[in-house]
């Protein structure tokens, strides 16, 4: 068992750098920022309690696994069996930054914002398993292996689910799968 100061230091090194991504994943899974913040707070408590069990590997994948599991526990406790997502997605910070950097004029910024909102809505409209795979890979940047370990499925299943999810996303956005 780690002393509390050692545990706090490890928590700061392993968990804190990934809190933004943790909030993003929780937001995608819960559908809103307030619930996501609750999930991340609970995840931080769980991560701190389990910090001595971290055995190496990707800290990001470890943290996001805790967030994912906490999210499912939270949803089972606080949500009805059928989950309705709001049509007011708060956005993904990373996508907003990319859109903001590329937009030099007010007109370009409006177009970028509209495009970002369209993509966010399309992701929210994906079935849960598809949305989860897309968020973990394309937004949080986890490797196929990290996703496979997190979801306890073979890498091939990750790849096929991601391909299907991307095809659904392309269809939702009105682009051919070859263009996506």
Language-model features: where?
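A short, charge-rich alpha-helical start-of-domain segment used by transcription regulators
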Residues: 1-24, 34-37
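C-terminal edge and immediately downstream basic/flexible tail or linker adjoining helix-turn-helix-like DNA-binding
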Residues: 2-5, 9-11, 83-84, 93, ...
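Residue-level preference for hydrophobic side chains embedded in well-ordered alpha helices
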Residues: 14, 18, 22, 43, ...
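Helix-turn-helix DNA-binding motif, specifically the short coil turn and the N-cap/start of the second
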Residues: 32, 143, 152-157
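Structural recognition of an alpha-helix C-terminal capping motif at a helix-to-coil junction
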Residues: 38-45, 49, 57-69
